[in-house]
Every structure is written in structure tokens, then in C-alpha cells.
Amino acid sequence: MDSKEPTCMRTPVLITPEAEMGEEACRILRMYSASKTTVEPGEMKKFQALSQKWWDRNGEFAALHSLNDLRVPFIRDRLLMYSEKTHLGYPLDGFRILDVGCGGGLLCEPLGRLGAAVVGIDPLEENIRTAELHQSFDPVLTRQVEYTTCALEEMAMEATGTFDAVVASEVVEHVSDLETFIGCAAQVLKPEGSLFITTINRTFLSYAMAIIAAEHLLRVVPSGTHEWGKFISPEELETFLTSSGFSVEAVNGMLFNPLFGSWTWISNCSVNYALHAVKKKQSGDVSGRTNGREHGSERSESSGSPTDKL
């Protein structure tokens, strides 16, 4: 990867004059000078205990391994909707993707193999060490994927308008400040860049399936992984996204079958869902798209098969 890829700074940030940085960048820096964070200490403790188990396909993260069967094509196909590039072997060549809360790199690796230049960040150092160790066995991944220990708000202070896409998969239900989190995602994206989120709706059915069944009865997820009060509906999430300058382009329901350990697209978002939003181009912005094509206005919702809409 490019040696100039941003890495989160561990030293105090020097705030340069607003005339040099721009109003939005200065706003972000002022925000975090007040020690605002999206990292929840309690959530850190949960995942610290599991940091060595990311690559056990039959272990605690088995559901995330199988989720790649849906989320990787979803990300790939939505990005390629607006791209005129054709590279059969590496369809995401030329795309710069930030994977927030990357854990052990379960999503970074397949995106890197598709040709994307991927930066995976996680506030837990143990997760990053696990990701780097697994990456080290594949020369292709060492070129395509870079990992660093930091939170999204730290990246936002030094990587304004850097990425074509930001991915937050099974992350937003664990953050302490969703509004700040989405604002930081907007900050690091190029104009017309894509934000991909997979998460859990806050419904009685999601409580029954994601907590009672998955955590306590079937034990396919460690007990205490989720808190129902932190789940968020697509409508609530869209409100946050709209206020941060995003346009929601697709919302698709997903369902996990614990008996077979597999995921499928379904026609409603009552439990899990995947969302694609695009950062609106502001007046004076240069398009961040590599091809200059205008972004489509058609939105797909709760599709049983997203490829029908893509």
C-alpha cells in the first residue's frame, strides 16, 4: 500500500488556522479537543476477552465469518454501480476503504483480495495484533491491507476526505455516541463517498432472536455481547445520517439461521439489516467518484435479494 496511508497519531494534534484547514475540519478538531469519544469502555472489555478467537470459524465469531457471504457482495456491487472500471480479477482496484471496528480483520481481508486498498482500525490493540498476524501469512494482503489501533474520531482528525468508502459492520450497536460516529464517518469520506452499515433493529423480534435465542439458548454469540437498548431502527439511523449530510440509497433485511450457520436476504428489516448511504456533494466539492458518473436516485428498501436492485 501507499506509504503515505494515514495512521492515527498518538501525539497531541496541532490545530492549524481555519483558513488552512477548512471550517468542517476545524469543527471536528474542536469537537474532540473536548474529549468526545465514540468508544464504550464496557464494550472494549467484552471484545478484549475474545481477541484471540477471531479466526476460529466455528467459534464465537462464526456468524461474522458467514456474514461475509452477504456483506462482501453488497459492498462490492453497490460500489461498482457507479464505476465504469472493469477489472475482473480485482473489481475494487482503485477504491480506498476504511473498515471501522475491524476486529481481527474478517472483512478487511476479502475486500483487500478484491483489489481495494483497505485500512482497518480498531481501538483494541489486541484485535489489531490478531489481524496483523493473520495478514502476515498472505503477501497479497500485506500490500492491500493496513491496520492501526485507533478510534474513528482519531482518524477523522487527520484523514479528511480520504476514503471512497467507510464500512461499519456490526459496530454501531456498540458505540457510545452514534451522532459523533456518523459525523466522523462523513469527515473521512470523499464527496459522494459510500458508508456501509450492518446492524440490528430494535424490535421485540430482534430481542428474541439476537439476545434470547442467539446468546442464551443456542449460544452462537457470547452472552452479554448485545444490549437491546443500543439497537437502532433503520428510520432512526436514517435520521442521524441525513443530519450528517448523507442520502440513504439502500436498506436490505438479513436473517441468520443458527442451525445452518448461514445468512440470507429477507424482505423485512425486523432483525438485522444492511444499509448503504452516500455522502452528498456540497457546492464547490469535487466529486470523489473515480468515474464522474452522477449518483442514481433510485433507492432499494428491504429487498429479499439486493442483487435484484443493484
Regions found by a protein language model. Give the residues of each.
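N-terminal, positively charged/glycine-rich alpha-helical extensions of SAM-dependent methyltransferases
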Residues: 20-61, 65, 69, 310
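Conserved alpha-helix/loop element of class I SAM-dependent methyltransferases that forms part
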Residues: 66-93
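Conserved SAM-binding loop
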Residues: 87-90, 95-207, 237, 275-277
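Acceptor-substrate binding/catalytic loop of class I
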Residues: 199, 218-236
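Short, flexible, mixed-charge acidic loops at enzyme active sites
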Residues: 206-216
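Short alpha-helix
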Residues: 229-245, 251
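Core SAM-dependent methyltransferase catalytic element
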Residues: 262-310
